[in-house]
Amino acid sequence: MQGTLSVWLAKRGLIHRSLGFDYQGIETLQIKPEDWHAIAVILYVYGYNYLRLQCAYDVAPGGLLASVYHLTRIEYGVNQAEEVCIKVFTQRSNPRIPSVFWVWKSTDFQERESYDMLGITYDSHPRLKRILMPESWMGWPLRKDYIAPNFYEIQDAY
């Protein structure tokens, strides 16, 4: 079943895949990485002016990585804001997704965290570097195939 946004995108020839609705009735769409930046700009112009959340997850060991965006359309005088969930899947061997930092500035630290934990490179992000782990850390801790090191260095707070 397609939602209103999926129908609107299809009428304009924008390639996507409808993933149905989540348990709260929020429409979920899948966008290819190469189409994501253009569709993000279109969604912003269409009225999705607030990026509520960006996160990423490992679909399965050896499988795809996903970057998830929850967008909200906030309008003056409208009590119930429209929401949409966008999922962009990428290969784990060279995980690259266009950054939407220049569309929604609030994605800055969220994309950096996804890079730090899963190794997804967000192309054209102005400050893509580790944010939680030390720069010297090897690997991506939230990947399902990550092997934790046998040691952890604990530093005094003094």
UniProtKB/Swiss-Prot annotation:
GO terms of molecular function: NADH dehydrogenase (ubiquinone) activity; quinone binding
Pfam families cross-referenced by the UniProt entry: Complex1_30kDa
Membrane topology classification: Peripheral membrane protein
GO CC terms of this entry: chloroplast thylakoid membrane
Biological process according to GO: photosynthesis, light reaction
Enzyme class: translocase
Superkingdom per UniProt: Eukaryota
PROSITE patterns, per database record: COMPLEX1_30K
InterPro entries according to UniProt: NADH_DH_suC, NADH_quin_OxRdtase_su_C/D-like, NADH_UbQ_OxRdtase_30kDa_su, NADH_UbQ_OxRdtase_CS
Catalytic reaction(s) noted: a plastoquinone + NADH + (n+1) H(+)(in) = a plastoquinol + NAD(+) + n H(+)(out); a plastoquinone + NADPH + (n+1) H(+)(in) = a plastoquinol + NADP(+) + n H(+)(out)
EC number: 7.1.1.-
Annotated signal sequence range: none
UniProt keyword terms in alphabetical order: Chloroplast, Membrane, NAD, NADP, Plastid, Plastoquinone, Quinone, Thylakoid, Translocase, Transport
Subcellular location(s) per record: Plastid, Chloroplast thylakoid membrane
Family per record: Belongs to the complex I 30 kDa subunit family.
Function according to Swiss-Prot or TrEMBL: NDH shuttles electrons from NAD(P)H:plastoquinone, via FMN and iron-sulfur (Fe-S) centers, to quinones in the photosynthetic chain and possibly in a chloroplast respiratory chain. The immediate electron acceptor for the enzyme in this species is believed to be plastoquinone. Couples the redox reaction to proton translocation, and thus conserves the redox energy in a proton gradient.
Subunit structure: NDH is composed of at least 16 different subunits, 5 of which are encoded in the nucleus.
Name by which UniProt lists this protein: NAD(P)H-quinone oxidoreductase subunit J, chloroplastic
Organism per entry: Draba nemorosa (Woodland whitlowgrass)
Gene field: ndhJ
